[in-house]
Structures are given as C-alpha cells and as structure tokens.
C-alpha cells in the first residue's frame, strides 16, 4: 500500500468529506477519488460510503483507518526520534481527561513541570467522556488519557493512579459534613449520563437500597454543571477534586457521601499496541511524578500502588 494513499484516506475519514479533504490536501477531487479507488482495488474492499452528506467508512474502512493512523503515527515518531538525536525532546503530546476527573488539580502542575523540564514539548489537552477518550487512544489520536474506572477495552491498557471519594455539592440547604443516600434520594439531582463512572456508582448505590434518584438533568459539561448548581435548582455528585473546584466557584457546600461511602478509581490509559514516543514517555513520567508529589499527597485521595 502506498503511504500517501493511507494519508489521504485518514484525512478523508477525519473530515468526512471528499471535497473538503481535497481542499485541505491541495489536490483535485477527481484525483483524490482515484487514489481512494486505487486503494479499494488493492484491498479488494469498499472503504467508503458516499452520501449527499459526505462520506463514512465501511466496516473494512474502519479497520484500515485504525491501522493507517497507527502506521502514520509510527512514521512521525520515527522521523522525530531521528531528528531529536542529540537534541532536546520536542513535539506535541496529547492527553485526554474525562470531565469531573482530578484534571483541575493535575493539569497545572503538569504543565509547569513540562515547561520547566522540556520547554520544546507542547501539551495538547482534550476533555471528553471516557468512552470517547478510549476510542481516540485506539485510533492513535491521543497519547494517553486520564479517566475514571471503566470496563476493560480491547486495545487499551490501564494503570491505576489513585482513588477519590464522592461528595455531594450544592448551594441550598447544606445537609452537614456528611450525607447518606436516603437523604440524597429526596433531593433534585444533576448527574452525568448513564454510561459515566460516576453515574454507574450512584445508580448502583440507589439500586442496592431500592431507591430512585430524582434526576432533573443530565449534564456532562463542568461549565454547565457549575451554572446549574449556582442556580440552586439541585445538587450534584462529584469526586472530591472536582467537588472542591465547583464548590469554590459557586460559593457552595460539599458533603461527604456516607452509608454507603463511595469512591472512584482514576487510571492512566494508553494504547496497548503502540509504544509511546520519547516525548510522550517523558510526559508520562512527569505525570506520575506530579500525582505522587507531596503537594498532591496532602489531598484527600488514596494513591494506588
């Protein structure tokens, strides 16, 4: 297979349009279509479905896309590794964070550490759900991702980082330093969607006690959740680091959830079938160092060894 055709194919899938991909690649659309046709002929498979709204990959196209991204990324890493011989590490390292994670406590110390140790490395931070971040890892669109516990995913390796207790956050009628699930069942709740780790843990606790949560809104965005809590319409369940950040933003209260106590494990996820680039490996080591630093250890979370 021709390297350039793989590059064209990946760009088409990323953009979802032959016309727009041709413009970005500075190639005539008929010529780009011919490159795709040649690739399909080499593989004896249809790779793209063409519709009025654009193009989407077939099942065979999805498989090729995953492998093509890995090939292109490895080539980029090889070029960079050769270029960096005898030079300071440089390039981009992409890190994903799931909403509500300890990102607010980790990212700034990490950025400062990278800036001090490897000033030529540029960090790209991306926030999305754990499921989306894992998919981006598999497709080699991210170097690593920090997410809350998730079911094992083929093509992704996980390394346990720490545990955080869950807290209730609000602005009206503080229940005290701690609150049990029976009391929470009487409150209006803002929760993330039902596939998130936080939601699964809350639903499990309510189900064991045959209680029904009064969910008045499902919110993924921390910014939107902050506005919702500030309005006084309801309360939210968050890990401690996110709870402290939101509580400070809305001048609210936070209560530790007891009976039962609830916690979530945070993990560092990596592509299972690809080696990290030298710069990504360096950033990973800094990330682990930041999490285990004395400043972080003072926070109310449990490091996982």
Swiss-Prot record:
PROSITE patterns, sorted: HTH_LYSR (PS50931)
GO molecular function: DNA binding; DNA-binding transcription factor activity
DNA-binding region: 18-37
Domain of life: Bacteria
GO biological process: negative regulation of DNA-templated transcription; nitrate assimilation; positive regulation of DNA-templated transcription; regulation of DNA-templated transcription initiation
Pfam families per record: HTH_1, LysR_substrate
Domain HTH lysR-type: 1-58
Keywords assigned by UniProt, alphabetized: Activator, DNA-binding, Nitrate assimilation, Repressor, Transcription, Transcription regulation
Function: Transcriptional activator for the hut, put and ure operons and repressor for the gdh and gltB operons in response to nitrogen limitation. Negative regulator of its own expression.
Similarity field: Belongs to the LysR transcriptional regulatory family.
PANTHER family named among the record's database cross-references: NITROGEN ASSIMILATION REGULATORY PROTEIN NAC, TRANSCRIPTIONAL REGULATORY PROTEIN NAC-RELATED
Protein name per UniProt: Nitrogen assimilation regulatory protein nac
Lineage: Bacteria, Pseudomonadati, Pseudomonadota, Gammaproteobacteria, Enterobacterales
